[in-house]
A protein has these predicted regions:
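Phosphate/NTP-binding elements of NTP-utilizing enzymes
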Residues: 2-297, 304-423
């Protein structure tokens, strides 16, 4: 269907106005600032109004990395319901209004690319007038290609060598990187990320390749000993990209003991009850250092998830977030800025649903032996890789290390000639 032009150029005055707008230098701002300036959300029953960065504060730093010349790639690991795909919409808004350059979004298949174009891109144009007015609106526009008055083009594709090995494009975005293994080996030519990155190489530090996804591959070696605090268990897909990057994780700072910690599903606590609703509705999070209680909602008398997210920080592997706000330590360096957000901190997910789905899946496994529901909730809701039951063991290195007890320093009595030590395994 042919779109009507968004602008009228029937008069000399209109032509002059449009030419002046095209020649005007872009206003200097970050992607997150552009999102608040230009992006409108119209989701009746959920939220209607301008984009607000404090709704998903953990997206600000990854969004602003997209225009950094320090990195050529970004990997974002996160659960569903965290808003990670909105980063692309905000990047597009920034590009259209401030810094035009061709972009391509690669979905898991042709049908999902078409759906993304209709549900995401077209809605962005309709709901955000300042973005929609930049469409050329000619007959050349179609569901897979969008042209803008600045001359930039947005293309939507899917994992195939033909799509991923064409002309150079400075800005590439791969969504749902782990879904169905579609990007693991594209037509025998290599990973989707490597093929996409090859398209941006021409632009060197001004090119950017992004992959985002919740984890989708199983941990194959649960006994692997992690070498750094932020390293992920080795799996293919998005977590492999994360490990190649500078490995940032989202931290909260305890309001009581002031120690930073990563909000993780393992820190949630609930009553010991056969009633799953009772368990999930009373779930709270406890600080791993001092047991301070945190609640999901505000108004409970305990610090809430929203309050903690607003004060949260991304911490690179090798760094330590000090009480005065400074980062100490030597951060891991890489051309890939990589982020890993867990489901407990996701804005649009609730702790009661996380707990209910997990306990329901555990109960299903106990009664049927099926791990499908458990794997799904661990991957997509909790945002972590799944370890199959047959591979999990209480003798895993992390489990044994966690059991260690500090007996302190003892004094050897005078006259002792030697000491022995024995370990029972």
């Amino acid at each position: 269907m042919t779109q009507k032009p968004m602008h009228s150029s029937n008069t000399l005055e209109a032509i002059i106005v449009q030419s002046a707008a095209a020649a005007r230098p872009p206003e200097r701002m970050t992607v997150s600032q552009a999102a608040e300036r230009y992006r409108e959300i119209n989701s009746p029953g959920s939220y209607v109004g301008p984009w607000k960065n404090d709704t998903t504060p953990y997206l600000v730093e990854p969004m602003d990395i997209l225009t950094s010349t320090e990195f050529t790639s970004m990997a974002f690991v996160g659960p569903s319901q965290c808003g990670k795909t909105d980063m692309f919409s905000n990047w597009l808004a920034y590009a259209v209004k401030n810094d035009p350059a061709d972009m391509m979004l690669v979905q898991t298949g042709k049908d999902t690319a078409r759906d993304f174009s209709i549900r995401r891109v077209d809605r962005l144009h309709r709901q955000s007038p300042l973005i929609g007015e930049m469409l050329v609106g000619t007959a050349e526009d179609n569901v897979f290609d969008k042209q803008y008055t600045s001359g930039m083009m947005l293309s939507l594709g899917w994992p195939s060598v033909k799509v991923l090995s064409g002309r150079p494009i400075p800005r590439m975005w791969i969504t749902d990187y782990d879904r169905g293994g579609a990007f693991e080996d594209v037509d025998g030519e290599g990973s989707g990320f490597d093929l996409a990155q090859a398209r941006t190489n021409t632009y060197r530090r001004f090119g950017m390749t992004v992959a985002e996804s919740s984890p989708g591959f199983e941990v194959e070696n649960p006994k692997h000993i992690l070498k750094t605090r932020h390293e992920a268990m080795p799996t293919p897909g998005i977590l492999a990209l994360y490990n190649k990057g500078d490995r940032r994780r989202w931290y909260w700072r305890c309001v009581k003991c002031e120690n930073p910690f990563e909000p993780d599903f393992s820190l949630l606590h609930w009553p010991d009850s056969e009633d799953l609703k009772e368990c999930s509705e009373n779930a709270v999070l406890r600080c791993p250092h001092c047991n301070q209680i945190y609640a999901h909602d505000t108004g409970t008398g305990h610090p809430s998830k929203r309050e903690m997210n607003i004060a949260g920080r991304w911490v690179r592997d090798g760094q330590h977030w000090m009480p005065n706000g400074e980062m100490h330590g030597v951060p891991t360096r890489s051309d890939i800025a990589s982020f890993w957000l867990k489901g407990v901190a996701a804005t649009f997910s609730t702790w009661d649903k996380l707990v209910f789905k997990h306990l329901s899946a555990e109960r299903e496994y106990e009664s049927t032996g099926s791990e499908k529901a458990l794997k799904a909730t661990v991957n997509t809701d909790q945002g972590t890789p799944y370890i199959p039951k047959m591979l999990s063991s209480d003798r895993a290195p992390e489990t044994l290390k966690a059991r260690a007890k500090d007996y302190g320093h003892r004094t050897v009595p005078p006259g002792v000639r030697f000491m022995t030590a024995a370990i029972d395994v």
